[in-house]
Amino acid sequence: MKIGIIGGSGLEKSDILLNQEEIEIETPYGKHSPIKKGNLNENEIFILSRHGYNHEITPTKINNRANIYALKKLGCEFVLATTAVGSLRNQIEPGDFLIANQFIDFTKHRNITFYEDFKEGINHTSLAEPFSEKLRDYLIESCTELNFKHHKIGTILTIEGPRFSTRAESFMFRNFAHVVNMSTSPEAILAKEAELEYAVIAMSTDYDCWKKTEEPVTWKIVKEQMEQNSEKVKKLLLKTIEKITNQNTIKADLEFIKSKIRTIPNFPKQGIQFRDITTLLKDPEGMKKVIEILYNRYKDKNIDVIAGIESRGFIIAAILAEKLNASFVPIRKKGKLPAETISETYDLEYGTDTVEIHKDAILPNQNVLLIDDLIATGGTALASCKLIEKLQGKIHEVSFLINLPELKGIQKLSNYKVFTLVDFNNE
């Protein structure tokens, strides 16, 4: 996989990246900032030094179009950008990370789009959600696991530079944003136009100049704080790259799992496409991948009980329960459990059905994972959730191997967290 890193990360100065070399790409927009390529496990990492190795390129003079074009042409799918920011909020202290979810463009003199005309078609790119939610999730998870103080949402306001704000500007900016910098726009705009998964690690270095009890920001303050934070930034990037890599492996595994599920047309009646998991169950590699994905998702969630829905849900739930050292509990159709039960009736297209659980299956406040092989209309799953709640169990998540999105079953479970492995859309 190819991953781009923009800004000062420290990785390019370490021996973590193997086979480092300088890269230069010809672009329609002129010369890009210096790029260094290196290998990290199976990944190719491209580190773009936005301001140059000696910080010789001013914010306004950064050739953002050439930079993003070069990373796209090099084949990067993901881009992690680091940036120093001035905090506009008391709670965002120097040394904190902000994983921004929005930005405001306050620049005036920069080329902000690849689409200077519409000769090849109209393009109005949506920037409603300017940053990759997938990458933001990885960054937030990584900060949490590394125990780094961070803020999960916030708005960056980008100014022109290279000067810092006046005090009046700083007070005004506080009405709009959480932090201020000189780098994020138009970099984020261009990354969105280039269809890159792009996210920003904003490192608070100062309080700009609005806070009278603090010294107004200077380059010296910014540089010193960046140097103090450099090791943390490096660890955060490496942890996030590991998550990106793992997710890419999972994506390939899910495609393999899906390929092992057989579709039988017109079963059990005309017009039904039956998703048959018996072909997956008999495939050791496919089942191993299913259990590994679920195990890695729930291994740190303190699951007490795994409830499986009759009947194919039993298979996955029982195997996973053993691996997680959790109890396995069956949820069955009416009349199939031998001891005292409680029941829940739900509507079918024509008539009703009932599911039951043993009255002593779950203790109050136990953390319960509910599993079935497939979610279609969601009636059975919702009834099963209600059974668990009648016993005062806490539903951690409802997990399915297969989702049939056109039947909208997940919508019935809107009060619960739902996880699915593969979707079948009229295939």
Describe each region flagged by the PLM:
Residues 252-303:
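Active-site-facing substrate-recognition patch
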Residues 1-127:
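Metabolite-binding pocket within alpha/beta catalytic cores that recognizes anionic/polar moieties
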Residues 185-220:
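Zn-dependent metallopeptidase/amidohydrolase metal-coordination segment
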Residues 209-249:
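His/Asp/Glu-rich mid-to-C-terminal helical/loop segments that flank catalytic regions of hydrolases
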Residues 326-368:
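Short, glycine/charge-rich flexible loops or terminal/linker lids adjacent to PRPP-binding catalytic cores
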Residues 130-175:
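Active-site rim beta-loop-alpha module in soluble metabolic enzymes
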Residues 303-310:
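Short glycine-rich phosphate-binding loop at a beta-alpha junction
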Residues 253, 257, 382-427:
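PRPP-dependent phosphoribosyltransferase catalytic core
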